Amino acid sequence: MEIGVFIPIGNNGWLLSENAPQYKPSFELNKEITLKAEKYGFDFVLSMIKLRGFGGKTEFWDHNLESFTLMSGLAAVTTRIKLFATAATLVMPPAIVARMASTIDSISNGRFGLNLVTGWQRPEYSQMGMWPGDEYFAKRYDYLGEYATVLRDLWETGKSDLKGEFFQMDDCRLSPRPQADMKVICAGSSTAGMEFSAQYADYNFCFGVGVNTPKAFAPAAERLQVATAKTGRDVSSFVLFMVIADETDEAARAKWESYKDGADQEAIAWLGVQGAADTKSGSDTNIRQMADSVSAVNINMGTLVGSYETIAKLLDEVPTVPGTGGVLLTFDDFVKGVEDFGTKIQPLMKCREHIKPMLEAAE
């Protein structure tokens, strides 16, 4: 099973809580996290894109770096780990993104891939006059399908002449093309999102579900397998979890309870309002899960809480779900979390025994 880190490109990571660590994003912070991840054999890191935050007392995600420029910097200081940037496709033309990706492919010597998002938070785009109207919610994966087609045309052939509803290419050219196969990620959970991933993506990210229920995402993985059976493509599910670990189960649980007690209700309310704005896509979108009141303090991602031994056992259950390729991890404290994972959790994981020779050779 592959393991990646969802690096904190926005302030405070993924905890909307006054009791959680408070910090601003920086290149140095993300470099430290990424170099630790590379040292301990993590397979990849991914950064999101967020153009407007949720406010509140913690100013949640009001402070964000830009994904491509961050990953280009990380590409220059790493040697092995794979790097994924996120394209805000509503404001970044596909031909430009294709060239940016090819450039980072050159910097990283073939270690770069791309996460495509449609854009679900209207104020991110309306603030700069680039929101296409709420009818976009119903067409966003049609838009993304054309977008991905242009990318693939340019990366694979160096040319695109796509004439679609959203994009009109006229002998559009790209050179140099990427030296490595450019992997594409999507995080679709709706029916339309799953169908997009089955047709265009190499990996589909889905949310873990609940607390210490590492296999509860299985229905999402099964839906993806049904979708890929229709396209005949091999697309793996990668699952998003937050790890809150400590020496004992009790100590880890105390941290989790404290984070919930300090929930930033103003920021959570903003998330709920934005989640309700999409009335076109149905009830199975990621944003609907993120805004659910059950655990909005960490946007309702699957949460693993416990001792280092407990976390290792829980993560070993994940790859037993058919169609699972890996996990994408966040931490309450990223620097300490990645260090503890590399030294105290991963060595106990049966599904990570294959990396031990690599780590021993690097010592």
From Swiss-Prot:
Keyword match Flavoprotein: yes
InterPro entries on file: Luciferase-like_dom, Luciferase-like_sf, Pyrimidine_monooxygenase_RutA, SsuD_RutA_monooxygenase
Top class in the EC scheme: oxidoreductase
GO annotation, biological process: alkanesulfonate catabolic process; nitrogen utilization; uracil catabolic process
EC assignment: 1.14.99.46
GO MF, one annotated term: alkanesulfonate monooxygenase activity
Binding site for FMN: 49-50, 115, 124, 140-141, 190
Domain of life: Bacteria
Pfam families: Bac_luciferase
Cystine pairings recorded for this chain: none
Catalytic activity: uracil + FMNH2 + NADH + O2 = (Z)-3-ureidoacrylate + FMN + NAD(+) + H2O + H(+); thymine + FMNH2 + NADH + O2 = (Z)-2-methylureidoacrylate + FMN + NAD(+) + H2O + H(+)
Keywords, alphabetical: Flavoprotein, FMN, Monooxygenase, NADP, Oxidoreductase
PANTHER family referenced in this protein's UniProt entry, alphabetically: ALKANESULFONATE MONOOXYGENASE, ALKANESULFONATE MONOOXYGENASE-RELATED
Entry function: The FMN-N(5)-oxide reacts spontaneously with NADH to produce FMN. Requires the flavin reductase RutF to regenerate FMN in vivo.
Family the entry assigns: Belongs to the NtaA/SnaA/DszA monooxygenase family. RutA subfamily.
Protein known as: Pyrimidine monooxygenase RutA
Species of the source: Rhizobium rhizogenes (strain K84 / ATCC BAA-868) (Agrobacterium radiobacter)
Lineage start: Bacteria, Pseudomonadati, Pseudomonadota, Alphaproteobacteria, Hyphomicrobiales
